[in-house]
Amino acid sequence: MANKNILFIEPGYKNKYPPLGLMKIASYHGPHGKKDNLKFIKGEDRSVLNQHWDRIYVTSLFSFEWKNISKSIDFALEIAQGQASKVFAGGIAVSLMHKAFLDETKWRGVRFIKGLLKKSPSESMQLDEFEGELYANDHSKFPIEDHIPDYEILDQIDYDYPVADAYFAYASRGCTRKCSFCGVPKLEGGLLSLIHI
């Protein structure tokens, strides 16, 4: 089922680091995965409005960027012509403020993904096989979280990340502590050792 059109949206805020979650999802969909057609935009690039998109992903960063994140989700719905089932949103703010996103009535039907994509792609993305959703039958044991980020999608935008010449890898995820100021345990769960770097 290759050659589906997949759009990735990063809100128009300033940030140092590239959207690693979106980049892992791009790896799942891209040339080394499902072989779909990928497009990455930052902010509201209106050139994508007159195209058909099979799925639209929106990332989020910090909760104080609610306004920019909201604009991007609204824009994704505009692109999808109101078909909320095509829109998926995740990231830090969505994970930490999950209920606030779910409670927003204008976004009913949008899939708000909380935390890491550690389960099978169909389960992590809350896909419904009965509805015949794209890749809903992908119950593979290779979670999206374990994909190598697709750095090539960053070439599609005119934004320079201050740490653009770096590659990010994790030796572990999560944390055993529950510091009041930190969201890591809520986002990633308890401490989990990963591959050796």
Annotate the PLM regions.
Residues V184-S193:
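Iron-sulfur (Fe-S) cluster-binding segments and ferredoxin-like electron-carrier domains
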Residues I195-I197:
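Conserved small/polar residues in nucleotide/adenosyl-binding loops
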Residues K4-N5, E10-K14, P18-D165:
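Glycine-rich beta-alpha loop elements in corrinoid/cobalamin-binding modules
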Residues A171-C175:
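Short metal-coordination and nucleic-acid-contact micro-motifs, chiefly zinc-binding Cys/His arrays
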Residues T176-P185:
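Local cysteine-cluster metal-coordination motifs and their immediate loop/turn environment
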